C-alpha cells in the first residue's frame, strides 16, 4: 500500500484501488438486434418485445403472446398440456433426440414447441395456439401436430374461431415421417373447421418456414403477418444456391408477400389483439368489439 493510500479516506479510490463491480440482474437490459439500442427489460416486455426505438419485432415467448391475446383476469384452459414428445425412432445425430428433448424442455420450460389455449377475446370465446421458437426452433413433431388438431377440435365443439401464431423452422427431422404426417393431420383438422363454417386466422411471425409454411400456416381464411417476418418454404440462401441467381431485395419478407398477394394483411404486434377481435367478430357476425365494450 502506498503512503498516499494510507492518507486518503477509505471511501475515495486511488489509482491502485480496484473498482468494485456493480452487479446488474440478468435480463434487466436487452439489446435490440436491429438498431442496437439498449432496452430496459420490463419496458420491453410490456411493449410485447417490440423495440420502442425502431419498431423491430423481437422474439416473444408463446405464453406471453397468448396472454397478450386473451382477456386479462379471465380463466384460460390449456389444451393437451400433458402431451410430451417421445423418441420413437431412437434418432441420433450429434446428440440423441431424447437428450435434445430434455435440454429444450429445461431451457424453455415447455414440454414441446406449441401451446394451445381456450379463453375469451373481448368477451367472445376463442381458441388460440402459439409456437415457442425457443423449443428446438419451433419445429413441428407429433406433439405439435396433435395439440394443433385437438385445439381445432375444441374450437369445433365450442363453435368459435381458431387462431394460430406460427414461428417455426419446419418439420422436426428427428421424428422423420411422423413429423411429415403432421402436415396432413393439421390440414385435415382445418378442413373440418371449414366445413362447419368456423373461421381460422393464421398469424405468420418471424420466421415461418419449412413444413409449417407448407401446411396450416398458409391455410387461414385470413393470413396476417408481423412486419419484416421471414416467410417461405426454403430459406433465401438455399434458393440462391439452387437457382444460381440473386433474389430480389426483401424476398420472402412479409412486405414482399403482401405486395404479391401471398398474404392478406400486415399488423404490428401491439395492434394484433384488436385486429383479431375485429376480424373474428365480423366473421362470426358478432357485435363490433368496441360496441360490446361500450355496452
From Swiss-Prot:
Coiled-coil intervals: none
CC terms in the record's Gene Ontology section: acetate CoA-transferase complex
Catalysed transformations (reactions): N(6)-carboxybiotinyl-L-lysyl-[protein] + acetyl-CoA = N(6)-biotinyl-L-lysyl-[protein] + malonyl-CoA
Zinc finger intervals, C4-type: 32-54
Region Disordered: start-end pairs: 1-20
Gene Ontology biological process: fatty acid biosynthetic process; malonyl-CoA biosynthetic process
Keywords (A to Z) from UniProt: ATP-binding, Cytoplasm, Fatty acid biosynthesis, Fatty acid metabolism, Lipid biosynthesis, Lipid metabolism, Metal-binding, Nucleotide-binding, Transferase, Zinc, Zinc-finger
Catalytic EC class: transferase
One Pfam family named in its UniProt record: Carboxyl_trans
Subcellular location: Cytoplasm
Record domain CoA carboxyltransferase N-terminal: where: 28-295
UniProt-recorded Gene Ontology molecular function terms: acetyl-CoA carboxylase activity; ATP binding; carboxyl- or carbamoyltransferase activity; zinc ion binding
SUPFAM superfamilies linked: ClpP/crotonase
Cofactor binding remark: Binds 1 zinc ion per subunit.
EC number from the UniProt entry: 2.1.3.15
Pathway: Lipid metabolism; malonyl-CoA biosynthesis; malonyl-CoA from acetyl-CoA: step 1/1
Cofactor: Zn(2+)
UniProt binding sites for Zn(2+): 32, 35, 51, 54
Main location: cytoplasm
Complex formation: Acetyl-CoA carboxylase is a heterohexamer composed of biotin carboxyl carrier protein (AccB), biotin carboxylase (AccC) and two subunits each of ACCase subunit alpha (AccA) and ACCase subunit beta (AccD).
PANTHER family hit by this protein: ACETYL-COENZYME A CARBOXYLASE CARBOXYL TRANSFERASE SUBUNIT BETA, CHLOROPLASTIC
The family this protein is said to belong to: Belongs to the AccD/PCCB family.
Chain's role: Component of the acetyl coenzyme A carboxylase (ACC) complex. Biotin carboxylase (BC) catalyzes the carboxylation of biotin on its carrier protein (BCCP) and then the CO(2) group is transferred by the transcarboxylase to acetyl-CoA to form malonyl-CoA.
Protein name: Acetyl-coenzyme A carboxylase carboxyl transferase subunit beta
Gene source species: Xanthomonas oryzae pv. oryzae (strain KACC10331 / KXO85)
Amino acid at each position: 500500500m502506498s503512503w498516499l493510500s494510507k492518507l486518503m479516506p477509505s471511501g475515495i479510490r486511488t489509482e491502485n484501488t480496484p473498482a468494485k463491480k456493480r452487479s446488474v440482474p440478468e435480463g434487466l437490459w436487452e439489446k435490440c438486434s436491429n438498431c442496437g439500442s439498449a432496452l430496459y427489460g420490463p419496458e420491453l416486455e410490456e411493449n410485447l418485445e417490440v423495440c420502442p426505438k425502431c419498431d423491430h419485432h423481437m422474439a416473444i415467448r408463446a405464453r406471453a403472446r397468448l396472454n397478450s391475446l386473451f382477456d386479462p383476469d379471465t380463466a384460460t384452459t390449456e389444451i393437451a398440456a400433458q402431451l410430451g414428445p417421445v423418441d420413437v425412432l431412437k434418432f441420433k445425430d450429434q446428440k440423441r433426440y431424447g437428450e435434445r428433448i430434455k435440454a429444450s424442455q429445461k431451457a424453455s420450460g415447455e414440454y414441446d414447441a406449441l401451446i394451445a389455449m381456450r379463453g375469451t377475446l373481448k368477451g367472445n370465446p376463442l381458441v388460440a395456439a402459439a409456437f415457442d421458437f425457443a423449443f428446438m426452433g419451433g419445429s413441428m413433431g407429433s406433439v405439435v401436430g396433435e395439440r394443433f388438431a385437438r385445439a381445432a377440435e375444441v374450437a369445433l365443439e365450442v363453435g368459435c374461431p381458431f387462431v394460430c401464431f406460427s414461428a417455426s423452422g419446419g418439420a422436426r427431422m428427428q421424428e422423420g415421417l411422423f413429423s411429415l404426417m403432421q402436415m396432413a393431420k393439421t390440414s385435415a383438422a382445418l378442413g373440418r373447421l371449414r366445413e362447419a363454417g368456423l373461421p381460422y386466422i393464421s398469424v405468420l411471425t418471424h420466421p415461418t418456414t419449412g413444413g409449417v409454411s407448407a401446411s396450416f400456416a398458409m391455410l387461414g381464411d385470413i393470413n396476417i403477418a408481423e412486419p419484416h417476418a421471414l416467410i417461405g418454404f426454403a430459406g433465401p440462401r438455399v434458393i440462391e444456391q439452387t437457382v444460381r441467381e440473386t433474389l430480389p431485395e426483401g424476398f420472402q419478407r412479409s412486405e414482399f408477400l403482401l405486395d404479391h398477394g401471398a398474404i392478406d394483411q400486415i399488423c404490428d404486434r401491439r395492434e394484433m389483439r384488436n385486429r383479431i377481435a375485429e376480424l373474428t367478430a365480423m366473421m362470426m357476425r358478432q357485435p363490433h368489439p368496441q360496441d360490446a365494450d361500450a355496452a
